[in-house]
């Protein structure tokens, strides 16, 4: 089977930066090292960190004194970081710089009197962190969902870094017709936009698509949605163990894309499995 791999498949710059930082901290510290939440949304990568002795906690309350805490790629809720500082814990900030941008915008624009609207998943760690930096209540609009009525004269719209651009545009358009002043700040990561454009192009050129990445990874799920809209024979898997040969009957070329948190070795494992098909 011929396999066409998307140019952008695998770790983005921000994730690779955080992964390298975790490995460096694990190698240099004798004291316990934990990440505040899964460092990235990929079970295989998290398992590798565990083998290095890096644990995972859900909150600072679970951390023992003397432990080094690494903030994950998606950032953390501001109050949790304040608790860590108050306890004198060593904190290594692995937050992606692109995630820090919507955090800063939420804080700055809320101080300027704007009601903050975030296009994204309210349950995602990144959005929880962004909300914590706003100094006023926020409204989170789920991609594809209705835009609620907001009682505010000034509205500022930002987005989850992995949001689909068309959804951000849709929400801004709806709000622009309702409010006298709407400020739109595009906080979607450039890598996300490039990866999604790459996925669209790939899906239009192949007989089937496999998107590789954690089932809990928002950007990977979005890639699968984008590909499936163009090529119905699209599957989202975490590893080659989930693949079935019958899926690819009649296919000559299979496209392979992967989320920003998918390790290279996982992508290669899926590619090797596909190439072995006859």
Swiss-Prot record:
Pathway named in the protein's UniProt entry: Isoprenoid biosynthesis; dimethylallyl diphosphate biosynthesis; dimethylallyl diphosphate from (2E)-4-hydroxy-3-methylbutenyl diphosphate: step 1/1; Isoprenoid biosynthesis; isopentenyl diphosphate biosynthesis via DXP pathway; isopentenyl diphosphate from 1-deoxy-D-xylulose 5-phosphate: step 6/6
Pfam families, per database record: LYTB
Record-linked HAMAP family: IspH
GO molecular function: 4 iron, 4 sulfur cluster binding; 4-hydroxy-3-methylbut-2-enyl diphosphate reductase activity; metal ion binding
Known role: Catalyzes the conversion of 1-hydroxy-2-methyl-2-(E)-butenyl 4-diphosphate (HMBPP) into a mixture of isopentenyl diphosphate (IPP) and dimethylallyl diphosphate (DMAPP). Acts in the terminal step of the DOXP/MEP pathway for isoprenoid precursor biosynthesis.
Binding site for (2E)-4-hydroxy-3-methylbut-2-enyl diphosphate: 41, 74, 124, 161, 217, 219, 261
Binding residues annotated for isopentenyl diphosphate, in chain numbering: 41, 74, 124, 217, 219, 261
UniProt: [4Fe-4S] cluster binding residues: 12, 96, 189
Originating species: Anaeromyxobacter sp. (strain K)
Cofactor note: Binds 1 [4Fe-4S] cluster per subunit.
UniProt keyword list: 4Fe-4S, Iron, Iron-sulfur, Isoprene biosynthesis, Metal-binding, Oxidoreductase
Name of the featured protein: 4-hydroxy-3-methylbut-2-enyl diphosphate reductase
Active site: 126
Keyword Ubl conjugation: no
Protein's UniProt keywords contain Metal-binding: yes
Family membership: Belongs to the IspH family.
GO biological process: dimethylallyl diphosphate biosynthetic process; isopentenyl diphosphate biosynthetic process, methylerythritol 4-phosphate pathway; terpenoid biosynthetic process
Residues that bind dimethylallyl diphosphate: 41, 74, 124, 217, 219, 261
Required cofactor(s): [4Fe-4S] cluster
Swiss-Prot/TrEMBL catalytic activity: isopentenyl diphosphate + 2 oxidized [2Fe-2S]-[ferredoxin] + H2O = (2E)-4-hydroxy-3-methylbut-2-enyl diphosphate + 2 reduced [2Fe-2S]-[ferredoxin] + 2 H(+); dimethylallyl diphosphate + 2 oxidized [2Fe-2S]-[ferredoxin] + H2O = (2E)-4-hydroxy-3-methylbut-2-enyl diphosphate + 2 reduced [2Fe-2S]-[ferredoxin] + 2 H(+)
EC number of this enzyme: 1.17.7.4
């Amino acid at each position: 089977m011929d396999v066409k791999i998307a140019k952008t498949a695998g770790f983005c710059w921000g994730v690779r930066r955080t992964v390298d930082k975790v490995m460096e901290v694990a190698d240099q510290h004798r004291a316990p090292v934990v990440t505040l939440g899964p460092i990235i949304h990929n079970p295989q990568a998290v398992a590798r960190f565990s083998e290095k002795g890096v644990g995972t906690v859900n909150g600072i309350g679970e951390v023992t004194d003397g432990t080094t805490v690494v903030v994950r790629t998606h950032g953390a809720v501001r109050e949790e970081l304040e608790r860590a500082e108050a306890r004198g814990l060593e904190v290594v900030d692995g937050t992606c710089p692109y995630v820090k941008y919507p955090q800063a915008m939420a804080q700055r624009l809320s101080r300027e009197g704007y009601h903050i609207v975030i296009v994204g998943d309210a349950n995602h760690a990144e959005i929880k962190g962004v909300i914590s930096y706003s100094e006023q209540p926020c409204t989170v609009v789920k991609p594809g969902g209705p835009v609620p009525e907001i009682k505010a004269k000034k509205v500022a719209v930002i987005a989850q870094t992995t949001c689909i651009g068309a959804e951000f545009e849709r929400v801004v358009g709806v709000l622009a017709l309702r409010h006298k002043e709407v400020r739109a700040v595009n906080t979607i990561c450039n890598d996300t936009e490039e990866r999604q454009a790459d996925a669209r192009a790939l899906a239009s050129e192949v007989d089937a698509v496999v998107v590789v990445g954690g089932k809990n990874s928002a950007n990977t799920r979005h890639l699968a949605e984008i590909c499936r809209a163009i090529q119905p024979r699209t599957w989202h898997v975490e590893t080659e163990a989930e693949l079935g040969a019958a899926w690819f009957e009649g296919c000559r070329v299979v496209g392979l894309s992967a989320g920003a948190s998918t390790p290279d070795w996982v992508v290669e494992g899926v590619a090797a499995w596909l190439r072995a098909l006859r």
